[in-house]
Amino acid sequence: MRHYEIVFLVHPDQSEQVPGMIERYTGILTQAGGQVHRLEDWGRRQLAYPIIELHKAHYVLMNVEASAESVEELETAFRFNDAVLRSMVMRTKAAITEASPMAKAKDERDSRRSSEGERRSAPAEATEEVKETAEKAAE
């Protein structure tokens, strides 16, 4: 079995269908004895150039170990699904399991946002404590 990196773009109007599509496509690979090493749903992102007058698409990345026949079957499924705008299958030398740069950037943004939220809530808690001490002093 060989290792592959697969990226496919889904029509933005079909974003709700992506989890089902991922399940169907991973099922094709695992039924043939393949294994999914990494699966990342990057969500709806801006396209570099318009495809069929669309400026956004839903991106999905998969790193798999599978037979050539099952990957060929997957490519056929992509071709006959109108919701899949583009797909790319690349053969890799080894299994890639670490997070992609896209996922790392998203994790950093999420952690930054959560730390900013904590900083914003901390002053509010401090002012509540000041109010409580002021009320006690007034009594």
Curated annotation (Swiss-Prot):
CDD domains: bS6
Gene3D superfamilies: 3.30.70.60
GO MF annotation: an example: small ribosomal subunit rRNA binding
Cellular component terms (Gene Ontology): cytosolic small ribosomal subunit
Pfam families per UniProt: Ribosomal_S6
Domain of life: Bacteria
Annotated region (Disordered), positions in chain: 97-139
Record keywords: Ribonucleoprotein, Ribosomal protein, RNA-binding, rRNA-binding
Name assigned to this protein: Small ribosomal subunit protein bS6
NCBIfam families assigned to the protein according to its UniProt record, in alphabetical order: S6
Family designation: Belongs to the bacterial ribosomal protein bS6 family.
Transmembrane segments: none
Gene Ontology BP, a term: translation
Function: Binds together with bS18 to 16S ribosomal RNA.
Basic and acidic residues bias spans: 104-139
